[in-house]
Regions:
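Polybasic/polar functional segments that serve as interface/processing modules
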Residues: 2-42, 54-87
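Catalytic metal-binding acidic patch
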Residues: 44-46
Length: 99
């Protein structure tokens, strides 16, 4: 395995761990991580979590974005933020869906 591939694997493992911790710290419910790399051409990993209300969903997404931005990790796209019934955060090879 090339050094770059090892680095990317370590980075993705650290990112998955960080996202799971942030979701747990923000009291997200029903947290599931799904490996879809062999089933999707769009992404490799999907996190799915739920909040108790639209306010909670928005707070979870806000905290996730804020904490990851501190490590210079910014979402490529955000969907559903205005209504906050569900919010999709696109981090390229990793998606986070909070509903």
């Amino acid at each position: 395995m090339v050094a770059r591939e090892r680095y990317l694997l370590k980075f993705m493992e650290a990112l998955k761990k960080s996202i799971k911790t942030i979701l747990e710290d923000n009291k997200a419910e029903s947290i599931v991580m799904v490996d879809v790399k062999n089933k999707s051409s769009v992404t490799d990993i999907m996190f799915i979590a739920s909040g108790r209300s639209t306010r909670h969903v928005k707070a979870i997404a806000d905290n996730l974005v804020t904490k990851l931005k501190k490590n210079k990790i910014k979402p490529l796209g955000v969907e559903g933020y205005t209504k906050s019934e569900w919010i999709l955060l696109d981090y390229g090879d990793l998606l986070v869906d909070v509903m």
